[in-house]
């Protein structure tokens, strides 16, 4: 798992209170990890703060899984 993926996983575990084993790249924030719409907004804000990237609303709507977040952050940080 990449450094970005590890950091995303840590944020998800802290914000959603889920078991780290459930936070896989294919895990859906809503369907698999039990996030609601407010949780997803808070996660996006946490990702922006942690990685120093801006995630526009239209992009945030496409970040549905842990892997989506990692890919977006890696691309935005490049």
Curated annotation (Swiss-Prot):
It is found in: Cytoplasm. GO terms for biological process: lipid A biosynthetic process. GO terms for molecular function: acyl binding; acyl carrier activity; phosphopantetheine binding. Pathway: Lipid metabolism; fatty acid biosynthesis. GO terms for cellular component: cytosol; membrane. Gene3D superfamilies: ACP-like. Pfam families: PP-binding. Residues 2-77 form the Carrier domain. The modification O-(pantetheine 4'-phosphoryl)serine is found at residue 37. 4'-phosphopantetheine is transferred from CoA to a specific serine of apo-ACP by AcpS. This modification is essential for activity because fatty acids are bound in thioester linkage to the sulfhydryl of the prosthetic group. It comes from the Bacteria. Keywords: Cytoplasm, Fatty acid biosynthesis, Fatty acid metabolism, Lipid biosynthesis, Lipid metabolism, Phosphopantetheine, Phosphoprotein. The keyword Protease does not apply. Belongs to the acyl carrier protein (ACP) family. Carrier of the growing fatty acid chain in fatty acid biosynthesis. This is Acyl carrier protein.
């Amino acid at each position: 798992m990449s450094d970005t993926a590890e950091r995303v996983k840590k944020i998800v575990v802290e914000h959603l209170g889920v078991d780290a084993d459930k936070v896989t790249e294919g895990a859906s924030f809503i369907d698999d990890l039990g996030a609601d719409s407010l949780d997803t907004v808070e996660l996006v804000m946490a990702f922006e703060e942690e990685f120093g990237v801006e995630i526009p609303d239209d992009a945030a709507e496409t970040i549905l899984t842990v892997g989506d977040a990692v890919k977006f952050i890696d691309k935005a940080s490049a």
